[in-house]
């Protein structure tokens, strides 16, 4: 943090101790993380309804923050509305789309046929049913709560306390997944399962686990490198560094057990990149007595992980015909309604009208590509809103800060998940959605707190001279001419 060495001990306590809003956000974030990590069904009404209830605490947290924050925060509400604008826009698009439903019925004699009705492509549409409300409001609640991580924390020590707990939670879920694979279980412990074997831990689809593990693998290794940079850090063997490194490798190596080939390949390649960064950091920046052996071990593990990722890419069935047909159907839907798309969760309902004949009788919820499904459901308008938001925040960081290492390492995980979204459906999972925006907003907030004074990060610079139009007394600014009597 800028000029932190010149801060008095009393001011450091004021900065680093939690305010009531920070305490509330800390607890709510951990509760939401526990729920999405352990309740694996991505469309569970219990999960989505609980997330919606927890998300309703967002205005309470912000209002508490406004009343109890010790510094100037006149940018609080402008930041909130800017950060959450995409969520409100998508929710508004969904509500407007309810006025025109593209699905209808045609009755011929005693037969009833489902048809796609003509619609106005210049207005949003929606083919959703009543259950869609819970889904979209649940995801909006997740987004609103995670966005407060970019607004409420006033010190980097907040993230130094919450990130280890979040990393531990993710690693523990991965440990349970390893146990299940080792025991050869056909369904997660204490659940009825889905009937399929492509699960990991409590994630019913292991492609979702691969995206989740990618994010927290980067977070674990990023925390390792951060702890190693502190001047008062212990020798590596005696510090928490080995635990972070073990957790990151545990999460990354799970890619070898994931059946979804392309997501597992991205996970393994991301682990390779993070281990290579660790190798370079220990060789160039560390003064640890074991730095050479640590760098050598990390380098060898990076090579093995890289080789595993390449093998997964070129394995059979990495690009199956069914996935190709599903993506083609999504692209055809997009071409038929390119401006606003067909509405949230409409892909599965319209798929019978656009799918290949080889998929007749098979039920699919997703298009095997979040990007194509997003275009089919939200159109060009939605793509511009979401991508524009991400690009604007990334450009702001790159133009203003750029060299903050923890932020860079966390954003590597976010970028890897966006790559997975090109060929799989990670954002269908509430756990991945929550983890992505949690890490994204933490990374950006860390950058802001690292390069700004604590009393200026959320405030305009104070104007010590009041404008003439706002003064309550007359202002004389003309040249004084003395008159002799």
Where are these regions (language model features)?
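Membrane-interfacial, low-structure loops and terminal tails that flank and connect transmembrane helices
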Residues: 2-16, 66-79, 228-241, 282-290, ...
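Alpha-helical transmembrane segments of multi-pass inner-membrane proteins
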Residues: 2-36, 50-60, 87-94, 130-154, ...
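Short, hydrophobic transmembrane alpha-helix segments
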Residues: 34-47, 66-69
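Loop-to-helix transition at the N-terminal end of transmembrane alpha-helices
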Residues: 41-57, 338
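Transmembrane alpha-helix boundary signature
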Residues: 61-75, 94-109, 120
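Extracytoplasmic loop-helix module adjacent to an early transmembrane segment
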Residues: 106-119, 318-337
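Juxtamembrane membrane-water interface segments that cap and precede transmembrane helices
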Residues: 115-128, 190-204, 321-325, 356-374
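TM-adjacent membrane-interface loops and short helices in multi-pass inner/ER membrane proteins
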Residues: 325-364, 371, 378-383
């Amino acid at each position: 943090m800028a000029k932190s060495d010149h801060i008095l001990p009393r001011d450091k306590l004021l900065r680093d101790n939690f305010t009531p809003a920070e305490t509330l956000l800390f607890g709510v974030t951990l509760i939401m993380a526990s729920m999405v990590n352990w309740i694996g069904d991505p469309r569970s009404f219990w999960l989505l309804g609980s997330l919606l209830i927890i998300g309703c605490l967002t205005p309470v947290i912000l209002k508490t923050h406004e009343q109890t924050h010790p510094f100037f925060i006149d940018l609080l509400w402008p930041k909130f509305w800017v950060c959450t604008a995409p969520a409100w826009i998508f929710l508004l698009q969904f509500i407007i789309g309810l006025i025109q439903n593209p699905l209808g019925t045609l009755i011929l004699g005693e037969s009833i046929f489902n048809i796609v009705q003509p619609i106005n492509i210049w207005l949003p549409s929606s083919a959703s049913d009543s259950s869609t409300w819970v889904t979209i409001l649940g995801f909006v609640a997740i987004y609103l709560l995670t966005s407060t991580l970019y607004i409420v924390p006033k010190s980097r020590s907040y993230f130094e306390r919450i990130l280890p707990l979040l990393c531990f939670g993710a690693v523990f879920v991965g440990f349970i997944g390893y146990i299940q694979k080792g025991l050869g279980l056909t369904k997660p412990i204490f659940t009825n399962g889905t009937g399929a074997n492509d699960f990991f831990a409590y994630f019913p689809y292991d492609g979702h686990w691969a995206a989740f593990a990618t994010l927290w693998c980067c977070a674990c290794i990023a925390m390792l490198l951060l702890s190693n940079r502190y001047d008062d850090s212990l020798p590596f063997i005696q510090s928490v560094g080995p635990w972070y490194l073990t957790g990151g490798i545990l999460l990354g190596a799970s890619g070898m057990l994931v059946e979804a080939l392309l997501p597992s390949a991205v996970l393994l390649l991301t682990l390779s990149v993070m281990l290579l960064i660790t190798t370079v950091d220990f060789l160039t920046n560390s003064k640890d007595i074991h730095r050479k052996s640590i760098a050598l071990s990390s380098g060898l593990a990076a090579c093995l992980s890289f080789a595993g990722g390449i093998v997964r890419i070129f394995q059979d069935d990495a690009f199956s015909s069914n996935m190709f047909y599903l993506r083609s159907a999504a692209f055809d839907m997009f071409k038929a309604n390119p401006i606003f798309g067909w509405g949230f969760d409409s892909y599965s309902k319209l798929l019978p009208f656009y799918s290949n004949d080889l998929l007749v009788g098979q039920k699919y919820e997703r298009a095997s590509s979040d990007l194509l499904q997003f275009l089919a459901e939200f159109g060009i308008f939605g793509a511009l809103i979401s991508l524009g938001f991400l690009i604007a925040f990334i450009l702001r960081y790159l133009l203003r800060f750029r060299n903050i290492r923890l932020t860079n390492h966390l954003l590597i995980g976010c970028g890897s998940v966006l790559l997975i979204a090109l060929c799989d459906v990670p954002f269908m999972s509430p756990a991945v959605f929550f983890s992505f925006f949690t890490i994204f907003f933490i990374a950006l907030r860390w950058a802001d707190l690292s390069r700004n004074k604590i009393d200026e990060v959320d405030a305009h610079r104070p104007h010590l001279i009041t404008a003439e139009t706002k003064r309550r007394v007359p202002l004389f600014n003309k040249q004084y001419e003395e008159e002799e009597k």
